[in-house]
Amino acid sequence: MRLSECLFRSILFCVSVLTASVSLRAAGTTQVFFSPEGGCTDAIVHEVRSASRSVHVQAFSFTSLPIARALSEASKRGVEVAVIFDQGIVQEPHAAMDILVAAGVPWFLDREHSIAHNKVMVIDDSVVVTGSFNFTTAAEHHNAENVLVIRDVDLATRYQANWKLHRAHSQPGTLPGTLAAPTRSSRRVRRP
């Protein structure tokens, strides 16, 4: 075998290993919702309100007050709620974030990636909510989006493992009033 052919096969093997997908046998049930005005937010709120143990969220964008309220209520009734946001969240309006902070929901910023574009909830280790739908008002009322609610323990286990992977490299968030980068004057050191 020539060196170039050997090198090609080695590269092909590495690429196939790195891009391997996981095949899961279909089990459980799936519901689909579309927007605008197709019930995506209501479906998500329903699932969060049905949670009894945990709701782990990965969100690129987050301005939906109904979803924020549902997460807050879940936390207050003892459900473990934690949210990983894309670092760009700090530039969005903070009304939904304020609801989470007031409820004591821990949240984290994923700065490991250029964009943390996930839109996922893993609920009670058995339900996955995912799709193109950002957890925003615009996604419900203006955008063409979709949400899948998948009840499948094996799939939820895979998503939960991915959530934990991202949580491991994410940094704890700070209160909304301190999200902005330090100003030049706030970085000055006072000298005695």
Can you annotate each of these PLM segments?
Residues M1-C6:
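N-terminal secretory signal peptides that target proteins for export/translocation
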Residues R9-S21:
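Bacterial N-terminal signal peptides
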Residues L24-G28:
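Boundary at the C-terminal end of the N-terminal hydrophobic targeting segment
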Residues Q31-F34, H56-Q58, A82-F85, F108-L109, ...:
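Structural recognition of the beta-strand scaffold that forms the well-ordered cores
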Residues H46-P106:
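Primarily the HKD phosphodiesterase
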Residues S61-L65, Q87-Q91, H113-A116, V127-V128, ...:
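Solvent-exposed loop/turn segments at secondary-structure junctions
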Residues I123, V127-P192:
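Signature of lipid phosphatidyltransferase scaffolds
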